[in-house]
Amino acid sequence: MNDKILFIDRDGTLIHEPKDNFQIDSLDKLLLEPYVIPTLIALKNIKFKFIIVTNQNGLGTDLFPKTKFNKPHQFMIQIFKSQGIKFDQILICPHLPEDQCNCRKPKTGLISCWLKNKSLDMPNSYVIGDRDTDIQFAHNIGIQGIKYHQIHFNWKKIHKYLMQNSHRVAHIQRITNETNVDVKIWLNQCDQNKINTGIHFFDHMLEQIAIHAKIRMHIITKGDLHIDDHHTIEDTALSLGEALNQALGDKRGIGRFGFTLPMDESIAQCILDLSGRTYFDYQAEYSLQKIGNFSTHMIEHFFRSLSSKMHCTLHLKVIGNNDHHKAESLFKSFGKSLNQAIYIQHNQIPSSKGILL
């Protein structure tokens, strides 16, 4: 299993950065940022590992002798250690900007072993820092950056944000006279899908959503298939849509939009906006009434029901010759679009309104 890593800047993020010379070169300059210790303790408890990544201009030269750096730095480490907080690595670039080294943030030389070994849990790892270079560093790694600010996005807010994000999980149960549906969704995990609706082709289609959205789904539906497949498909869609909407929470940081065009001789188009407003448009024709034991007219009803509970705008269109390919391409393209839309890119609400409802 890959590691959930927080790559944390030191000066200005873990500890206060003095404005006189931007160096913590004596004990009297050492001051922890507010709430950093309780936040790191809480994040350690949900299996995050911590790595300090810091630029220290001219460290080891007359500009910044190591003797002045080491004493406050080691005291800082001892404070964290006394509270049960361990840093797995402390990575320091001692160079000046003009040295053009490959280890100074936002370059990624200091963490090259992590990138080479592919041991990062990319969706669940973050860079936390107070400078734009930290956010660029995150972008260069391919993970999310969180810009620390003592007022606007402090350690208390980072705690709340990462606790919400680390879960992004939902569990919905829907029991009616016609069906019993149990849906669990993990947006930050993939593989190990368990899907059983009693309709084999439908199971296959739902798995395509999970695979291409890179999420984990457990869906168990028991329905009145002795009558037909309508209630089973409809109630699964309603439950899945509600679970996806619940797992997204306040949608802070998500891409919000997604679109894609895949498969074989079929061309499927999916345009998705997790806007909080429901709108659905569907354009598809099939020559067969059924694919296996799955009614083709229920594809439209599935996505209409799903979008109503997701509170999203969804446009779907497909053309092609093979009904199996057309159906599969729609489910795959929706999964791809969903992957784009739910991917966390920053820590802001993706709307000028400041809310997505």
UniProtKB/Swiss-Prot annotation:
Span list, region Histidinol-phosphatase: 1-167
Chain residue ranges for the region called Imidazoleglycerol-phosphate dehydratase: 168-357
Localisation per UniProt entry: Cytoplasm
Keyword Hydrolase: yes
Alphabetically ordered keywords of this record: Amino-acid biosynthesis, Cytoplasm, Histidine biosynthesis, Hydrolase, Lyase, Magnesium, Metal-binding, Multifunctional enzyme, Zinc
Gene Ontology CC: cytoplasm
Stored InterPro entries: HAD-like_sf, HAD-SF_hydro_IIIA, HAD_sf, His_synth_bifunc_HisB, HisB_N, Histidinol-phos, IGPD_sf, ImidazoleglycerolP_deHydtase
Enzyme Commission no: 3.1.3.15, 4.2.1.19
GO molecular function ontology, one term from the record: histidinol-phosphatase activity
Cofactor requirements of the protein: Mg(2+); Zn(2+)
Sites where the protein binds Zn(2+): 93, 95, 101, 103
UniProt cross-references to NCBIfam families, sorted A to Z: HAD-SF-IIIA, hisB_Nterm, Histidinol-ppas, PRK00951.2-1, PRK05446.1
HAMAP family cross-referenced by the UniProt entry: Bifunc_HisB, HisB
Family in the record: In the N-terminal section; belongs to the histidinol-phosphatase family.
Protein name: Histidine biosynthesis bifunctional protein HisB
Lineage of the organism: Bacteria, Pseudomonadati, Pseudomonadota, Gammaproteobacteria, Enterobacterales
